[in-house]
Amino acid sequence: MTLRVLTVDDSRTILAMLHHTLSNAGFEVLQAEDGRQGLDLLKAESVDVVITDINMPVMDGIEFIKNVRATGQHNSLPILILTTETSQDKRDQGKAAGGTGWIVKPFDPEKLISVIQRVVH
């Protein structure tokens, strides 16, 4: 079974890097450029894991996670936060919102794949 990954980031460069990394690992990749687009995709598509940035326009990653969890439909969906943020306060906010894991940019492709495989199995 091919894992489906939703990536949410306002940087097209990061989205392209994620697409390349994840596609080469055999994952199907869906992309959104902000939290609002991410929510719309989650309403229309089934995914196995989400990777989201925190600092984005329209709807940031923390609000995105809160909204995903608030629906009650995706309580067990792994949501990984991929960000340049390193503060403990932001980590606490991400965890409190319902984030599953935290990865700091720039990311190691092998580590990212390993974390995805761990959280979905």
Protein language model regions, located:
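C-terminal output helix
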Residues: F107-I116
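A Lys-centered signature of the CheY-like receiver
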Residues: N67, K105
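Short hydrophobic/Thr-rich beta-strand motif most characteristic of the beta2 strand and flanking loop
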Residues: G26-E33, L41
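Charged docking surfaces used in two-component/phosphorelay signaling
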Residues: A16-N24
